[in-house]
Each structure stands twice: as C-alpha cells, then as structure tokens.
C-alpha cells in the first residue's frame, strides 16, 4: 500500500516536471569521441557523517574510476558526476531524482545511502527505467526483492541472511538463550538489523532461541545503559549487539569492561554488515591487522593515546564479530585509499568545497566508503562488459542491469552479485588469536534454503576459546546468573562431619571450661531466679490514663444510702493518694505503682523483697514486685479500687455508724498484728494514706518493707502527724523503730475514723463510743511501754460488738435493704401514674394510626409497605365551602367543621371504615385496609356515604340557619399500597391509581350525589345485587383518565321512597346535557395520601388536586 502511494506521488511529480521541462532550452551537445556517462549521486552531508557522510566517503568515487582505468576498464568512457545532498529525506530524494532524470539525463543513480530513501528512489527509477546502485544503510530485507525493485542493485547482503547465519552459529555452539542490544540512531539501521535477526530466531524452521532481553542503548546516556547492562547481567551471558560507527563499537567495549562483563562467562557477538570486523578505518599510521589491513578497534582515534587501549583490548578478547567477508586482497591499495580519500573529494572532478568537506577529519575514513568504492567499481565493470558500439545500448536498462550479475575483488572483499541483484551472503565469524590478530573462525554461506557453515579449525578449545581457558562458555552458567546455584563443594558437603570431628578433639577442653562455668552460672542463675521472683520488667508496665479517683462510682453503695448516724461531715482535707500512686497495667491487670529514687540495693534488701512476695493476709495489700531497670525504682502492689482510707474520709459525703467504724479499725489492727509477727517486725510508715480499701470495704495495709527506699518527691511535713514522738525526737530510721511506734500511728488513724476529720480532732466527736475512744487514748500514750500491743488491741475490740455483727458487708447490705423498702411504695405510686399516661398515649396513637401499625411502631419494629388487592376509597367535599367560609368568622368556620366531622366520625365507627385524614372541607376514608374484609368494603363505604348524605340534609348551621350543607362524594374500588412514611410524626399513607381515580370521581361529581366508577359499581352489583338503587351517568371526560362511564348511587332500595319526579331532578339525563368543563390530563405522577399531618411537596395530594380542579372549573365557567 505504501509503495503504491509513493509510486502515485512520483508519477504526479514526474508528470508536472515533464511539462515544465518542455519549456527548457535545448542544451544538447554533439557527441564526443568518448561516451560521457552521467552519474547522479544522492548523498548525505550531515546525516550519520562518520558512516555515510559525503566528506569522508565521496572521495571513493573518483578513486574507483582511477582504479578501473588501471585495470583496463572504462577506457572508452568519460564520467560526469551530479551530486545532490538529499540527507535521506524522502521529499528531497523525489526532487533530486526528477532533476537527475529529466534535467541532467543521468545514466545511473547512486544512493541515497538510507533504506527508506532508497526505496523512494527505486520506485522513481523504475518509472523512468534507470538503474540504481545502493550503498550504506541499505541491508533491509525487502530491498532484495527483485520484483518490487527490478533496477536496484546493492553490494550489501540483507540483514535477514545475517540472522540465519547467527542462528546457525548458535546451533554450532549449542546456545539457546541470548540478549540483543543495539545503539540508537535516527535512521534506525541497527534497529532494522535486530528486527530481521529476531525474525529469523522466531522462524519455525530455525532452532528455538530464547531472547530474554532486547534493548536500545545510547552513546551518551550512561544512566539508561547502566540499567540495561544490569538487567542483562542477571538474565543472559550470550549477547548480540550492533553499532553503526567505530566510536559506538569502542564505546560498547569500554562499557562492558566497566560493568564487569568481560569474565569467562560472557560472549559478546557483534552483528555487522560493513566488512570491518575488529578493525577501524583510520589513516593515523597505527598498526593494522594483517588479515584486513584495518587498524584494531582498541587503538585510539587520535594520534596519541586515551588511556583506554588496555581496557578495550581486554574487552575485545570477549568479543566475536559476525560480518560480511572482509578479507581484502590488495591491502596496500586499501591503505592508499584510507590516506587519500578525503583529499580526493576536495580535488577534481568532485571539487567539494562545502564546510563539511573542508573541515572533515582527515584521519578516519567513512564507515561505508569502501562500499561506495565497490558500487562505482561494479558499475564500471558492467559498462565495460556491455562492450557495444551503439551509444543507445548504455541507456537501455534491460541491457545494462544484467551486466551487474558479476564478481570482482573489491575493497570489501570478494564481491559476488546474485541474480536478485544483491551481494551473495557470505558471512564470516571473526575472533582474536593468541597474537591478538583477527582470524576467521567460520564461514557461513546461504544456498537457498539452507545456511551452510564451514569451520576453519579442527580443535575448538584452543582456536576459539583461547582467552576463555580453552572452555566454551554456557548460555546459562552453572551457578546461575546471580551465582546462587553453584554445586556444593567437598568441604561444604562434608562440613558438618568435619566440624564434628574437630569438636571431638577439643571436647575435653570444652568440658573442663564448661565445668568451671557451670558452677559460676548456677550461682548466677539461682540469684537471677530469686531476683525474678520480685523484679518486674519495666517494659511490662504500661501507663494508664485512668486515675484512682475515677473509681468514685464504685462507692455508690454507701454514698447513696440514707444517713444512719449524725455527725460532722465537713472534712476538707484532700487526700494525697493520687499523688503517691499511679495506676498501670501489668500482665493485663490494673496495679498500683509508687516511684522511689534510684539507690543501691543490698543483699538484705533483695532477700526482704523475696519474703515480702510471700506475705499473704486479708488485711495486707500484696506486694507484687519492684522495677529496677528504669530511671526510678517502681514498687508494684495490688490495686484497691476504692482508694486510701484518707481519701474516703476526706470526701465525707456519706455517714458511718458505729459498726462501720469498728470494722475499719479492726482491719487496721489485724493487719498490724500480722506484720508484727513477721520478719518485718513493724510497718514503719503507717498512716491513713497507706491504708487502702478494696471493693469489699476491706482495709489493706500498704507501703510496708520499703525501709531503705527514698521517695521520688520530698514527703510533706503533714505526714509527721502520724509519727510517734520518740521517732521524731530521735530521727530514727525504720530499722531502729519499735512496734510501739506503729501503735501510735494506729491511734491517729482510729481518731480520724471516729471524727471523720484530720488527726487530733477526736474531742469534737459527739457519738457515744467511749470504749473505742478509751482504746485510742491508750494507743497514743506518750511512753511507748504504756501502749498496748497489736494483739491486745485485737482482743479488746472483740468485746466491743455483739457476735452477731462481725461482717461489714452484711451490715452494708442491711442498710441497703432498709433503704429499698422505703422506695417500694414510691415506685408503686409512680407505676400507677405511668400506666394511666400510657393508656392515654395509646388512645391518642390509635386515633392517628391503625391499631396494628401503632403496635408495631411501639415495639420498635419497622412497618413494611403492604399491598391490598381490593379496597374502596372514599372522597368527599363540602359544596360551595368557600362561599360558606366567607360568611363566617374563622372561629365559626372551625366550629362548623368540628360539628360536622364529629358526627361523621361517629358514622365511620358504626360502619367499620378507616378514616385516613381530613384537610379543610375534604374528607378521605378507606375500607378494606389495614384489615382485609373481603368485598364488604364497597358496602361499608356506600352505606357510610348514604348516612353522610342523610345527616347533611338535617344538619343546620347555627349562625346561618338558611344555609344548607351539601356534600359531593366520589367512590372507587381497586388495588392500592399502604405503608408508614417518615420517622418523625409517621404517617399512614395510601399509594396507587385507585386513590387518584376516587378523587377524580369526587371532583367531577354533583352536589348531594354519590359518584361511582364502573369498577366500584360492578363490585357493588356483583356482591350486593338488588340492594342499592343506581343509575348510569353515561360517559364523562375525566382528567388524566379520558372518557369513563360512571354511575350514581341514589340509596338503598328498601329506603327509597321519594317520587319519580324527585329522581328525575337528581339524576342527569345524559352527559351531553352537562356543561362540565374538564382541564387537560396531567402528566403521570406518584399518588399517595396519608393518615395524618401536612403533605410534603413530593407526595401527590388528591384532595389538593381535586380542589384545584374545582377552582379551575369555576374560572372557566366565569
């Protein structure tokens, strides 16, 4: 498709150019003795200058002509060269081609040196039958298609053949996993080569090749290149790569060396179509390969060195080149060509004077200059072989093109052109020998459809893998790409056995060492085990925001109880319980902690803590342990949720009777008695703040045994109130104190309990508890020997109360029972009042909602919408109510409707009909829901309607005795849906077209008549035949429904007694005689009515709709 478009564009362009050329003057000159051959050259000046630039390649053209004449060719021809710098641009190529053919009338076109541009030139040449010779980056496979390009000849094999040669090479060396890298360029030469090679690898006819990575790298982008090489290192060891210039080739070798990819595992195979292999085309006079006559790639491109020679040379030993046969027979002339090619382009007949030609590097020949030489040489050989005296023969493309099928020794080796006008694909695999000379290791020749290989060595190891230790690398290393799968060595395999053997030798020494260590460690272990009994790791203590005071609610049992005794309750002392203790979590339980300054713990202290852990008494707060691995010592004890005794007494918001005080004092005395009998001998820090109270109102002594620990904060002087006088005078430590000091502290605590005030306030107590007071006075005697012991205190207290009252909790429960009995009568009184109010609320609720719905709502249940197959809906409206209301004051209007609807409500209750709502003079009722009643609903509604009419005839307005009240009633039967809508002020609503139609019956009815739909009339006659007197009204246009036949109900048959004349007055004759104006039908809408409250705007209101309809009717009538 693309080629067809190009041909069309070329045809249009050539037609225009032919028309334009007809007006040019005739410049034809008489033929000379020698035939002048005009050669059009489409060159590139600034595109890939180092490879195909005219400044470094163009000199090959005159030098090829000179070489042809040396060998006796083209003696009868002169040459004229027309050079156009198309820069591989397709538009420029078309222009240049037309000028070559039409204006300059060239005999042959050389170039352009790019694949896509060459295709355009070939299409143009085919149209004008001109031969085209290709060189440069023209190895694309499709250029070898002689059918598409019959006049195109190239001296380069196509890259598809290179892919077959690469596939054959992988088969020879048993490789199947490869990576493919190539340098980026604008003309995408290497990209095309790699695509063709990849296509051959994926061809089913070739052995399977796994391409693990294919990536593009950049000459000056080291960051991207680093990422690519890191990926290659982890996935492949056989790497195909492609470059366009010698600079890129040398850059690649430097990069693999810097990335440590030149080890014995890596094989780098360069794919080339330039006949250069390991060489570079320079004229610096540096050493050359004897095989190709080119300078080795590791030599710098300057006259000096660049310090990379050694690195590149080492990297080249891991490199192979798969290239077109590059062995040049005449290496001297190749050297001459390299030295003089830049001079030749500037000299006649080229005479290139552009900036590029004048400033070109004179040391490096263009990469594809030798191909340009061979192209010109091929054309000269073809001209000579034509050997015709007829000048017109040389213009006949069908004669000259077959002469291109020939062979000769060129500057790119032996050139053999096949019948498809491309060079015969003869590839060679080049490597370096031990002398760093380029040698051919294998030759690949394609004989359709097989790629044959001829090895140039007998022994592979030394010839091919000399630099690899004579061993062929694997495409997958034995140890894997990351070195994690290496086989286990002998030492690694038997390491455990060797270690065991060595261990046996030194076992005796180890046993001796262990024996000594065991004695030491056992001692330390025993010490650690002992310490672990009382040590609490600080990490196991978690702070809690909850404070002891938050447990005040736990004391509600006594705080809420009535007062049992009278006394002072104005204690204002604030407890320091929360200041002394902190609540924390330890092993998922709340505990109390107290901080002490860090100090040295003696062995006696540690032994004391172990024994304290074992203390167990109901009036001793259990010591859990001590944390010593933080900045402070933290003592951990069991939590008493009611706080300290001082904290309870300081609040003073409940009363304590004699027995309550007795039990608390007794618990303190029992705790002291237990401590005085233990190894501790005494408490030493007894005060009301260290007497803790648990949930059962049981007192437990805390902060005992902390003799040598100093509190974190300086204790307030207030604590000295509980210290015995002899301790204050002598500044005694706990270890120097006697148990009598605790007795003194006990007396102070007892006085606090008795007075519910601070210490030393016992004289203000007015209750009669002389025995306890006498005991307290004995305990705070000045002389320690006069104070009773803790055991004596307990024995004396046993006789202060009767044996029946020994438990404080029983006493508390008795107090609560007395309080409960006083509440029962009050509760019974309140219950009666609540029952009465509940009945009133139920009555009010039943008037607002159906009973079943109300019961579900009271139970907290949701009321799901319910569908009813058959119900009868009733609508009524007071006729001319607006006129009546205008004659009444607002209060008279309300009284009028109240009198009327109160009697209507009585009639409704008599007929089992549910009243949904009434708004203004509108009235809505329904029968058949929420309790289904079969088909009795039509009878109930009709009977109720007749009763309404009967009542209205006798109803008189007190303040308007001459005015009568008339109703207009509409009835319809059918299905509907009912449900509760809303949460605040819920409403029982009806939904369905049945409701709307009933409203239309009312609004289209007549005063004092009952208007029925055909459905309601059929239901009435079907189930209650001969019960009611009805008549057809005829067909009426109903808003939103169209034409409907409706009916009148005049009364029950047994009740009708009016004369026929009255019937004829009330019964309309036909619809045609009625002047009834009907508004247009409304749009479909959701219709619903509710049982209570005002309607939201989103819910359809039949009452409002039929009232609006009535007002619209009046407006039209006026």
From Swiss-Prot:
It is found in: Cell membrane. Expressed bilaterally in AWA and ASI sensory neurons and in RIA and PVT interneurons. Residues 872-1002 form the Guanylate cyclase domain. Residues 516-1118 are cytoplasmic. The chain crosses the membrane at residues 495-515. It is a single-pass type I membrane protein. PROSITE patterns: GUANYLATE_CYCLASE_1, GUANYLATE_CYCLASE_2, PROTEIN_KINASE_DOM. Pfam families: ANF_receptor, Guanylate_cyc, PK_Tyr_Ser-Thr. Residues 558-875 form the Protein kinase domain. It is an enzyme of class 4 (lyase). Residues 1-21 form the signal peptide. SMART domains: CYCc. It catalyses: GTP = 3',5'-cyclic GMP + diphosphate. The keyword Electron transport does not apply. InterPro entries: A/G_cyclase (IPR001054), A/G_cyclase_CS (IPR018297), ANF_lig-bd_rcpt (IPR001828), Cyclic_nucleotide_synthase (IPR050401), Kinase-like_dom_sf (IPR011009), Nucleotide_cyclase (IPR029787), Peripla_BP_I (IPR028082), Prot_kinase_dom (IPR000719). The keyword Transmembrane applies. Glycans are attached at residues 222, 351, 361, 387, 420, 452. Its EC number is 4.6.1.2. Keywords: Cell membrane, cGMP biosynthesis, Glycoprotein, GTP-binding, Lyase, Membrane, Nucleotide-binding, Receptor, Signal, Transmembrane, Transmembrane helix. Belongs to the adenylyl cyclase class-4/guanylyl cyclase family. PANTHER family: GUANYLYL CYCLASE, RECEPTOR-TYPE GUANYLATE CYCLASE GCY-1-RELATED. The protein kinase domain is predicted to be catalytically inactive. This is Receptor-type guanylate cyclase gcy-2.
């Amino acid at each position: 498709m693309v080629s067809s478009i190009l041909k069309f564009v070329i045809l249009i362009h050539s037609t225009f150019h032919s028309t334009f050329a007809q007006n040019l003057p005739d410049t034809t000159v008489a033929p000379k003795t020698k035939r002048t051959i005009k050669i059009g050259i489409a060159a590139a000046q600034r595109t890939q200058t180092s490879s195909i630039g005219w400044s470094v390649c163009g000199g090959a053209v005159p030098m090829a002509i000179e070489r042809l004449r040396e060998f006796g060719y083209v003696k009868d021809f002169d040459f004229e060269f027309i050079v156009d710098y198309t820069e591989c641009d397709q538009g420029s190529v078309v222009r240049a081609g037309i000028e070559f053919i039409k204006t300059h009338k060239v005999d042959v076109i050389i170039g352009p040196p790019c694949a896509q541009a060459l295709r355009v030139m070939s299409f143009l040449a085919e149209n004008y039958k001109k031969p085209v010779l290709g060189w440069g980056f023209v190895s694309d496979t499709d250029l070898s298609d002689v059918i598409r390009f019959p006049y195109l000849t190239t001296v380069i094999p196509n890259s598809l053949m290179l892919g077959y040669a690469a596939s054959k090479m992988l088969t020879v060396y048993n490789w199947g996993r490869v990576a493919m890298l190539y340098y980026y360029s604008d003309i995408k030469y290497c990209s095309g080569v790699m695509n063709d090679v990849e296509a051959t690898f994926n061809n089913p006819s070739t052995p399977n090749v796994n391409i693990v990575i294919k990536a593009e790298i950049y000459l000056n982008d080291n960051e991207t290149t680093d990422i690519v090489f890191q990926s290659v290192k982890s996935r492949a060891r056989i790497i195909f790569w492609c470059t366009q210039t010698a600079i890129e080739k040398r850059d690649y070798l430097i990069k693999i060396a810097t990335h440590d990819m030149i080890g014995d595992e890596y094989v780098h195979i360069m794919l080339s179509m330039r006949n250069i292999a390991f060489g570079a085309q320079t004229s610096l006079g540096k050493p050359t390969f004897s095989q190709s006559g080119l300078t080795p790639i590791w030599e710098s491109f300057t006259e000096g060195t660049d310090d990379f020679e050694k690195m590149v040379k080492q990297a080249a030993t891991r490199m192979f080149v798969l290239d077109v046969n590059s062995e040049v027979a005449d290496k001297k002339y190749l050297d001459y060509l390299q030295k003089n090619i830049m001079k030749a382009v500037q000299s006649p007949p080229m005479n290139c004077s552009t900036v590029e030609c004048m400033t070109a590097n004179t040391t490096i020949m263009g990469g594809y200059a030798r191909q340009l030489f061979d192209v010109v040489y091929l054309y000269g050989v073809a001209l000579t072989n034509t050997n015709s005296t007829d000048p017109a023969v040389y213009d006949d493309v069908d004669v000259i093109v077959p002469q291109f099928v020939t062979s000769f020794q060129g500057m790119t080796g032996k050139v053999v052109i096949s019948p498809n006008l491309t060079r015969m694909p003869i590839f060679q695999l080049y490597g370096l020998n031990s002398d760093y000379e380029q040698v051919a290791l294998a030759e690949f020749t394609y004989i359709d459809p097989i790629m044959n290989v001829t090895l140039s060595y007998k022994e592979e190891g030394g010839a091919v893998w000399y630099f690899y230790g004579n061993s062929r690398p694997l495409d997958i290393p034995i140890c894997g790409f990351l070195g994690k799968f290496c086989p286990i060595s002998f030492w690694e395999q038997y390491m455990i056995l060797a270690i065991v053997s060595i261990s046996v030798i030194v076992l005796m020494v180890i046993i001796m060492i262990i024996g000594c260590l065991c004695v030491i460690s056992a001692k330390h272990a025993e010490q650690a085990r002992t310490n672990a009994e009382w040590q609490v790791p600080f990490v196991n203590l978690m702070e809690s925001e909850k404070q002891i005071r938050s447990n005040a609610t736990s004391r509600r049992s006594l705080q809420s109880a009535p007062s049992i005794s009278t006394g002072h309750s104005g204690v204002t002392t604030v407890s320091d319980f929360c200041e002394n203790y902190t609540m924390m979590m330890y092993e998922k339980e709340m505990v109390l902690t107290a901080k002490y300054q860090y100090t040295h713990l003696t062995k006696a202290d540690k032994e004391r803590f172990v024994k304290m852990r074992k203390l167990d008494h109901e009036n001793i707060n259990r010591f859990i342990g001590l944390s010593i691995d933080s900045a402070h010592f933290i003592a951990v004890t069991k939590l008493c949720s009611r706080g300290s005794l001082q904290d309870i007494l300081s609040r003073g918001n409940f009363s304590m009777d004699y027995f309550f005080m007795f039990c608390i004092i007794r618990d303190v005395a029992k705790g002291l008695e237990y401590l005085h009998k233990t190894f501790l001998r005494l408490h030493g820090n007894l005060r009301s703040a260290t007497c803790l109270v648990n949930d059962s109102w049981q007192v437990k002594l805390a902060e005992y045994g902390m003799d040598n620990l100093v509190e974190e904060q300086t204790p307030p002087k207030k604590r000295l109130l509980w210290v015995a006088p002899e301790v204050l005078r002598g500044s005694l430590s706990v270890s120097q104190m006697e148990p009598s000091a605790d007795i003194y502290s006990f007396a102070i605590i007892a006085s606090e309990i008795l007075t519910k005030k601070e210490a030393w306030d016992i004289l203000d107590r007015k209750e009669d508890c002389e025995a306890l007071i006498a005991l307290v006075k004995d305990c705070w005697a000045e002389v320690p020997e006069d104070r009773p012991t803790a055991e004596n205190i307990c024995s004396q207290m046993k006789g202060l109360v009767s044996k029946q009252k020994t438990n404080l909790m029983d006493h508390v429960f008795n107090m609560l029972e007395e309080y409960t009995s006083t509440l029962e009568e009050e509760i019974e009184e309140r219950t009666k009042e609540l029952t009465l109010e509940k009945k009133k609320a139920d009555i009010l609720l039943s008037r607002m909602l159906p009973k079943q719905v109300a019961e579900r709502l009271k139970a907290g249940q949701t009321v799901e919408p319910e569908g009813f197959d058959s119900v009868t809906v009733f609508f009524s409206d007071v006729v001319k109510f607006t006129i009546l209301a205008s004659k009444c004051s607002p209060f008279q209007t309300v009284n009028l409707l109240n009198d009327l609807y109160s009697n209507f409500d009585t009639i409704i209750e008599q007929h089992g009909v549910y009243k949904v709502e009434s708004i203004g003079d509108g009235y809505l009722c329904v029968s058949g829901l929420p309790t289904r009643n079969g088909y009795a609903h039509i009878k109930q509604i009709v009977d109720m309607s007749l009763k309404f009419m009967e009542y209205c005839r006798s109803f008189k307005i007190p303040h308007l005795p001459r005015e009568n009240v008339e109703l207009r009633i509409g009835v319809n039967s059918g299905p509907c849906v009912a449900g509760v809508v809303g949460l605040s002020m819920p409403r029982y609503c009806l939904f369905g077209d049945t409701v709307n139609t009933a409203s239309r019956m009312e609004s289209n009815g007549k005063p004092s008549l009952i208007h029925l739909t055909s459905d309601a009339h059929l239901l009435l006659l079907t189930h209650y035949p001969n019960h009611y007197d009805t008549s057809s009204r005829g067909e009426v246009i109903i808003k939103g429904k169209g034409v409907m036949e409706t009916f009148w109900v005049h009364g029950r048959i047994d009740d009708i007694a009016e004369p026929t004349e009255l019937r004829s007055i009330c019964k309309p004759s036909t619809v045609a005689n009625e002047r009834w104006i009907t508004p247009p039908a409304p749009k479909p809408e959701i219709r619903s009515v509710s049982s209570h409250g005002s309607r939201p705007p989103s819910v359809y209101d039949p009452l409002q709709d039929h009232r609006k309809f009535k007002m619209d009717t009046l407006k039209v009538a006026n």
